[in-house]
Amino acid sequence: MSGSMFSVFSLLYLLSVCSACYISNCPIGGKRAIQDSPSRQCMSCGPGDRGRCFGPSICCGEGLGCLLGSPETQRCLEEDFLPSPCEAGGKVCGYEGRCAAPGVCCDSEGCSVDQSCVDGDGDATAVSQPASSQDLLLKLLHLSNPAHPYRLHQ
């Protein structure tokens, strides 16, 4: 009897440490299918299709800024129904985000002010002599609370 109990516990232990791909969250083609598929650019959105989708209701573009939850972002909802993942443009910033507009970092859940998304090399002279009022505002926000970025959620 004790041998069978040991076998049962051993089996349960092995099942608990194994990572499985369950039917509810397994991508088509298996766990590694998403990594193997080539990334595509996210759908265009906004007025005149000048922006790109960064989330289900986030549309950002150069010269456009970011639109959150507006009628222009409705097209971004379709992105969830496409079988392959997309990659929004811009360099990597924040935590799993991408630069969406000058000074703005967005991920699939929201956007935040991020100094690394401002064009330029970010040296000390840029802090002392900002190029525009937008740069000045971004620098003041960054200096006032560098530990907690200002996050705009939907």
UniProtKB/Swiss-Prot annotation:
Residues recorded with modification Glycine amide: 29
Database matches in SMART domains: NH
Keywords recorded for this protein, A-Z: Amidation, Cleavage on pair of basic residues, Disulfide bond, Hormone, Signal
Keyword Ribosomal protein carried by entry: no
Pfam families according to UniProt: Hormone_5
Keyword field contains Disulfide bond: yes
Cysteine pairs bridged by disulfides in the record: 21-26, 42-86, 45-59, 53-76, 60-66, 93-105, 99-117, 106-111
Domain of life from the UniProt record: Eukaryota
Family stated for the protein in its record: Belongs to the vasopressin/oxytocin family.
Protein name, entry field: Isotocin-neurophysin IT 1
Organism, scientific name: Catostomus commersonii (White sucker)
